[in-house]
From Swiss-Prot:
Compositional bias of kind Polar residues: 68-80
Domain Kinesin motor: 453-775
Family matches, as InterPro entries: Kinesin-like_fam (IPR027640), Kinesin_motor_CS (IPR019821), Kinesin_motor_dom (IPR001752), Kinesin_motor_dom_sf (IPR036961), P-loop_NTPase (IPR027417), SAM (IPR001660), SAM/pointed_sf (IPR013761)
Disordered: annotated segments: 66-164, 178-308, 826-915, 981-1030
Keyword Nucleus: no
CC per GO annotation: centrosome; cytoplasm; microtubule
GO MF terms, alphabetically ordered: ATP binding; microtubule binding; microtubule motor activity
Gene responsible for this protein: kif6
Protein name stated in the entry: Kinesin-related protein 6
Keyword Hydrolase: no
Superkingdom of the source species: Eukaryota
Acidic residues composition-biased segments: 239-290
Entry keyword set: ATP-binding, Cytoplasm, Cytoskeleton, Microtubule, Motor protein, Nucleotide-binding, Transport
Organism field: Dictyostelium discoideum
Bias kind Low complexity: ranges: 81-117, 125-164, 181-197, 225-238, 826-839, 849-906, 981-1009
Length: 1030
């Protein structure tokens, strides 16, 4: 062991790492284990700095190259000696052959020691040289120990015995080296004799060079020496190149680690853990958290916190004073109604007249004040000298009288101004009432659409502050007519990126510019009327955590669905059902499959069913409320004790399902008249998305997903109209049983996130909502009786801070003429092919064309969009014409007065065609057909004769027909584009021809018989490629 420790010390000394030698001894590191060191073992020995790690790495690489793998069971010393013999033999070949083997070995060993001491780590060292160094070190230590003290005889004897053992080992090594050297010389001699014998047959005279054999041998020796030198140089270069590559790799690794640590520290100190990223929801102080609060704080990296937070749209946050979010809003006000424009003009005119009247009144007041001041100055400057006392009294009385008159006039003016202000206020009130009446008269909801049992709407939130900082893209396109497209980024097998489009259609789609009042009008407000007709209504929000569910339900400054519904319920109650019904509320949550009362200090509840199989919550407290403000105060108090916490995805995540029930009860009998339930579902999240290892948060997430899965199973059972619906699988489904059974109506608001990283969650939410929508459509198809269209009372106006941004043209009933004409015009332009196989994205037309087709258009635009194919039809068929047209047709000569100038219209620009989208759809549909062909081939081959050949051939013909249809469709579009310039030239030439025909030429006059023959020869135009397909 002493020998191995000395050897290890010498190895570390070569790399200037001898200071770490005690750590190697503590860990009992031997020479063999040292050679098998890895990067992970460096820290166990205390080597942590980058430079020391590099030195140790290069030392291990050099030692591994010098000591090849052990084949026999002999000791490592013998193997190292063999390597040394090979090195020594190579060196001896380069040196003179007359020297002895011992001298050569000694010289080589000395040279190796000197080179190692000088070059450090670049030049490889042999284990024999290390042994010689060990011997020298041992002799020096023995001499120093003998000279220092004469009492340590035992230590000397031990050191002498070690020295003898080492000397014997050296002698054995030298004998082995001599034997190997003798064998090598014999081999060289045999090769030389063979070489010389082969050279004897060489014809020297035939060669052009006048060289002797001796010169040839000398050249050969020189050539062999040069080759050896080149090989050695290449080996050294390769070795240095490998070392440089290893150094660069290590530097890159450590640089990356240092950069990650620096970024982590910068993010940690930059981020304010007490503030939400949006900067619009809360402004929490930087003090320590309150120990009495129910918020659960989970430690984690700063990058993982506040990933997705609840949001506030821009149009609401600006009014509240939170202006940090700067998101562009798409204000589409191209097609405002004429009534709104007229009202705006009238208001502007009234404001202008009022400003002029105010200016005139101010000028009159200033003039009166100037007159009063002048009179006072005259009275003050009046000279009373030379007058009696009676005269002075008389003048003073007159001055006082005039002052009283002036004061009376000023008081009358003030009274008139006050009366004018009151009149203006009353006029404004009347105008507001008229506007409200007009809005109420314009308010219209088609109950065939809004009266469905299950309606599904989607709301998209804007990108938050953190997502904008990460430069994430918005992958969701909200189209008119209740459509939605998700551009999901994907990669193919060849690592080429592409975007897969998914199209969804719902009952209502709201983009990021929509506020809570607009969402309320189209989701929850139609249900308010049903609870007054002894019905039950449910509105629940579903979506990923941080997608805006709680903001939709609660809102800010009384603009959430809770507050807006409470306003309309109490307004309807006071106007129609006063002293008949009263309002009672209950507020509870479902946390971990258990019920807790939020209005009674989280008292535990139980869910049961009565004899009529109706759900009853035992122990639930109800509070009688008389105003919307009192209702909102109860909700705020309940939310304070609701279970929330911070997760890896959202810092303020709702960890429970909160349920608010607004019940209408009869005052006399105390029986239930109607019930409205608002359900704020907890955020759905996957276990792989949670970066914290808290057991409680993972358990909460599992309970949330379990309840949502049970809800999905119930919806599926109702959709399939199965006999048994598993409402008892979860507490959530038991509570929601009334929402899906009986006289009930339900609205689901699916909240989605638009960022690219949440594409999978967004698609899962949309598919979940689409499944619920299918349930509603299946039930509506089963009940084919149409609902009578009736109008419900208009809602209350929006809150003050939402009036500026409120613009909802859907409330005004739209005429059916414009929609039908646009549809026919566009269908004539873009014929639809009967698709044999729908693509995955479910898009039959390009997105741009769908947007154009869904925008309402004026009749002029509709005429401009008519295809050019319809123009010759109007000219050729017998269409009723005006007298001017008949005159032009028969070419009747006209007087100069009758000849009117023909107004030439500029040629219409042809509509732009998006060939890329057409081609992409063509390729997608073609690929689907190819997939079906491959499937049919596999089925026919695997059937082994069970499928008849005729069916297989029929399938082939169908595939070919569908391919031909796709090809013809694309060719038709290309031909239509190529014919557009020709049609434009014809349109430009028509007015010129009409001018030429208007001149009287007797040769052009036709008889009636000729005209009849010409009409009989006229034929209708041939049908185009698309006429049969439309």
């Amino acid at each position: 062991m002493d020998f191995e420790n000395d050897q290890l010390y010498n190895w570390l000394q070569l790399a200037n790492l001898e200071s770490f030698y005690p750590n190697f001894i503590k860990k009992n590191v031997s020479c063999d284990s040292f050679l098998s060191f890895t990067m992970q073992d460096y820290g166990n020995v205390g080597i942590t700095s980058l430079q020391d790690r590099k030195k140790l790495f290069h030392l291990l690489q050099q030692l591994k190259k010098q000591t090849p793998p052990i084949s026999n069971t002999s000791s490592p010393v013998i193997n190292s000696n063999n390597n040394n013999n090979n090195n020594n033999n190579n060196n001896n070949n380069n040196n003179n052959n007359n020297n002895n083997n011992n001298n050569n070995n000694n010289n080589n060993n000395n040279n190796n020691n000197n080179n190692n001491n000088s070059s450090g780590l670049r030049q490889p060292t042999s284990t024999s040289s290390l042994l010689s160094n060990n011997n020298l070190m041992s002799t020096q230590t023995q001499q120093s120990s003998s000279s220092s003290s004469s009492s340590s005889l035992s230590s000397k004897s031990n050191s002498n015995s070690d020295f003898m053992q080492k000397a014997q080992q050296l002698l054995k090594q030298r004998e082995l080296e001599r034997q190997q050297y003798a064998k090598q010389q014999q081999q060289q001699q045999s090769t030389q004799t063979k070489y010389q014998s082969s050279l004897k047959d060489f014809d020297i005279t035939s060669s052009n060079k006048n060289n002797n054999l001796d010169d040839f041998f000398e050249d050969d020796n020189l050539y062999s020496q040069q080759q050896q030198q080149q090989q050695q140089q290449q080996q050294q270069q390769d070795f240095e190149f490998e070392e440089e590559e290893e150094e660069e790799d290590q530097q890159q690794q450590y640089d990356e680690e240092e950069e990650e640590e620096e970024e982590y520290e910068e993010d940690f100190y930059k981020e304010d853990l007490g503030e939400i990223d949006d900067g619009n929801v809360l402004d929490i102080s930087d003090d320590e958290p309150d120990p009495n609060s129910s918020c659960i704080i989970v430690e984690g990296s700063p990058d993982e916190e506040d990933d997705d937070v609840e949001y506030i749209p821009q149009n609401e946050s600006l009014v509240n004073g939170f202006g940090s979010m700067k998101i562009q809003q798409q204000q589409q006000q191209q097609f405002q109604p004429l009534q709104q424009q007229q009202q705006q003009q009238q208001q502007q005119q009234q404001q202008f007249y009022q400003q002029q009247i105010q200016q005139q009144q101010q000028q009159q007041q200033q003039q009166q004040q100037q007159q009063v001041q002048q009179q006072q100055q005259q009275f003050n400057n009046f000279n009373y000298s030379g007058l009696n006392e009676e005269q002075i009294k008389y003048y003073q009385q007159q001055a006082q009288y005039q002052q009283q008159v002036q004061q009376a006039q000023q008081a009358a003016i003030q009274q008139a101004q006050q009366a004018a202000a009151l009149a203006q206020a009353s006029q404004q009130q009347l105008q507001q009432q008229e506007q409200q009446r007009q809005q109420a008269s314009n308010f219209f909801l088609d109950m065939n659409e809004y009266g469905q049992r299950i309606r599904v709407c989607v709301r998209k939130r804007p990108l938050n502050k953190k997502e904008i900082a990460k430069s994430e893209k918005d992958i969701i396109e909200v189209l008119p007519k209740k459509d939605l497209i998700v551009n999901e980024p994907k990669t193919k097998l060849d690592l080429s990126k592409f975007i897969e489009k998914h199209k969804f259609t719902f009952d209502g789609v709201f983009d990021e510019s929509a506020n809570n009042y607009q969402v309320y009008l189209h989701t929850a407000y139609p249900l308010v009327d049903s609870i007054f007709h002894k019905g039950k209504a449910t509105c629940f929000a579903y979506g990923q955590t941080g997608s805006g569910k709680t903001h939709t339900q609660m809102g800010q400054q009384g603009d959430g669905l809770y507050a807006l519904a409470a306003r309309d319920i109490f307004h309807r109650l006071e106007t129609y059902f006063k002293d008949q019904l009263q309002v009672c509320i209950s507020f509870f949550e479902i946390y971990g499959g258990k019920l807790f009362d939020l209005l009674n200090e989280r008292k535990k509840l139980a869910c049961r069913e009565n004899e009529l199989q109706n759900v009853v919550i035992v122990g639930l407290s109800e509070k009688h409320v008389t105003s919307p403000q009192e209702l909102m105060n109860c909700i705020i108090d309940g939310n304070k004790i609701r279970s929330t916490g911070s997760t890896g995805v959202n810092s303020d995540s709702s960890r429970s399902h909160a349920i608010l029930q607004i019940s209408l009860k009869n005052i006399k009998t105390n029986k239930l008249h109607g019930k409205f339930s608002f359900i704020d579902l907890a955020g759905s999240e996957r276990g792989s998305d949670t970066y914290d290892n808290d057991k409680q948060t993972r358990k909460e997430g599992a309970d949330i997903n379990k309840s949502l899965l049970a809800l999905k199973e119930c919806i599926r059972a109702l959709d399939q109209s199965s006999k048994h619906t598993p409402f008892r699988q979860s507490t959530l489904t038991q509570v929601l049983k009334d929402s899906f059974v009986g006289n009930s109506r339900t609205v689901m608001i699916a909240n989605i996130s638009p960022n690219q990283s949440s594409s999978e969650h967004t698609l899962n939410t949309l598919r979940y909502a689409d499944r619920v929508k299918e349930l509603g459509t299946s039930e509506s198809n089963s009940n084919k009786k149409p609902v009578a269209t009736y109008n419900i009372p208009a809602p209350l106006p929006p809150p003050d801070h939402l009036k500026q941004n409120f613009n909802d043209p859907i409330l005004i009933p739209s005429t059916t003429t414009t929609t039908t004409t646009t549809a026919t015009a566009i269908n004539s332009q873009q014929p639809i092919i009967q698709q044999t196989s729908q693509p995955v994205s479910k898009i039959k037309q390009p997105v741009k064309q769908q947007q154009e087709s869904q925008i309402p258009q004026t009749p002029q635009q509709q005429q401009q969009q008519q295809p050019p194919q319809q123009q010759p039809q109007q000219q050729q068929y017998n269409i009723p014409q005006t007298p001017q047209q008949t005159q032009q047709q028969f070419n009747i000569p006209q007087t100069p007065k009758q000849q009117q100038p023909i107004q030439t219209q500029p040629p219409m620009s042809p509509p732009k065609i998006d060939f890329v989208n057409y081609h992409r759809n063509h390729v997608d549909q073609f690929a689907d057909i190819l997939k079906k062909e491959l499937i049919s081939i596999n089925q026919f081959e695997s059937s082994k004769g069970s499928i008849p050949l005729e069916n297989y051939i029929n399938n082939i013909e169908q595939f070919l027909d569908s391919k031909q249809l796709l090809i013809n469709h694309l060719r038709g579009i290309i031909q239509q584009h190529q014919q557009q310039p020709i049609q434009q030239q014809q349109q430009q030439q028509q007015p010129i021809q009409q001018q030429q025909q208007s001149t009287p030429q007797p040769s052009q006059l036709q008889t009636p018989q000729q005209r009849e023959r010409a009409r009989s020869q006229l034929q209708p135009p041939k049908p185009s490629i698309y006429s049969s397909r439309n």
